[in-house]
Amino acid sequence: MLAFVSLPFFFESVLHRSQVETGLLMTPWPLAVGIGAPIAGRLADSVSAAVLGAAGLVVLCVGLALLADLPENPTAAEIAWRMALCGLGFGFFQAPNNRSMLSAAPLARSGAAGGMLATARLTGQTIGAILAAISFRIGGHSETVALGMAAALAAIAAVASGARLYHPAGARPPKPAIVADAP
């Protein structure tokens, strides 16, 4: 969320793009999530969430770093492919990670697990917005600082996701859910 909050300010303040251009430049990210997440969801049946999540976060980290290091006066295409890379990475992280969290809960607690997932997501979005506001307060090229912070956080999260491989449950693909007949 830190990156997604700071990017419109980056496009307008640093790159001097109009509001319409900024809106269009934001579009490749969610489009790539829409492409990457279903693919990652299918792969999650045979590849562990730790591997997919770590790979997705590495791709997101690289995309954010490339956005923070854009050339002077970049073209829309130079921005768009970096945004798409971020979205693809985010989609590859989000789908298997959500599946892993929800499938780890007992069936009777699936509603609570969904609630916790939503709470964690909202907490992350809030912290991201706070970090963006703090970076804007710093001054200078604060939008670039925010993108750098987002890339660093994605790198840390990639390491944490990869560390799940060393946990017995994280080293193998999740088992398919078995729904028992109610008595």
Q: What role is predicted for each listed range?
A:
Residues 1-172:
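12-transmembrane solute porter fold
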Residues 174-183:
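Short, intrinsically disordered terminal tails adjacent to the first/last structured region
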